[in-house]
Amino acid sequence: MTEHAIVIGAGFGGLAAAARLRAMGRRVTVLEAGNQPGGRARAFEREGFHFDAGPTVITAPHLFDELFELFGKDRRDYFDLVPVDPFYRVVFPDGRHFDYVGDDERLLAQIAEFNPSDVAGYQRLVSHSKRIFDVGYTQLVDADFSRFGDMMRIVPDLVRLRAYKSLYGLVSEYIQDDALRQVFTFQPLLIGGNPFRAPGIYLLIHWLERKWGVHFAMGGTAAIVRGLTRLLDEVGVELRLNAPVERIEVVNGRAKGVLLADGTFLGSDIIVSNADPAMVYTRLIDSSARRKHSDASVARKRYS
């Protein structure tokens, strides 16, 4: 009998997990509490205009390509991604602006206009960002981290690369001009982070953008959601909207299914949740079934 997998949440992560589970031969059901898929990448319309409610740019397009290739399909048949140039335009209060681009010659020329002595510093910064990328992304993107030792193995490398420093502090070691420091440290703002507190590991984003560019989905991120849900429908994944999960049923330490808000019980061999972890622990899993992550410990967590 084919194993049944339930995915809670139809955001990008949930839809991607559903695709990978289906490619592994599982029967998959995606449960979404809202009335449309997408999660934080949902879209809405107001006065004839369409808005992305969450993310707007894509910096690793090949990850979407992989999902479609699992089924022998071409992502371009579902939605289009176009490179953005410049990646970003940073505008300062004094009227100056900086076009953050992928072309070295154009980028270095702009840096020289702001502060010629920062050209050499930027080149060292790029080298540092690549080293952090090689550890913080290449080695960790597929890491399990189910065991504490898995994470501890890469700590020496991150310490050596000073990734424990704040992003702003790390960039300031190489860049002297305050405006340029802002240009190369704003990325944590995109996920609600503070460049003065976010760890230096975020410097890897700079190399990631140089490596793969910044892309926009024609039609907005809603087009990506439509493409992914179309793919899942074609390969036999069931997507249920307006289906909030009330509780994850745990028996003898193993999740056995979910209880929906309408009283429906769905049995499952595998449960993957793409919902916020704090909500999952405190609202979906009974405290008696949690070896750790008590309500009190979750309440003490700090969020960006």
PLM region descriptions:
Residues 198-209:
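Residues forming anionic-ligand binding surfaces in small-molecule and nucleic-acid pockets
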Residues 214-234, 248-249, 259, 264-304:
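Glycine-rich loop(s) and the adjacent beta-strand/alpha-helix scaffold that form part
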Residues 2-131:
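N-terminal glycine-rich phosphate/pyrophosphate-binding loop and immediately adjacent elements
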Residues 91-198:
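Rossmann-like flavin
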Residues 156-167, 209-230, 240-242:
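Short beta-strand to alpha-helix junction loop
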Residues 4, 256, 269:
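Conserved acidic residues
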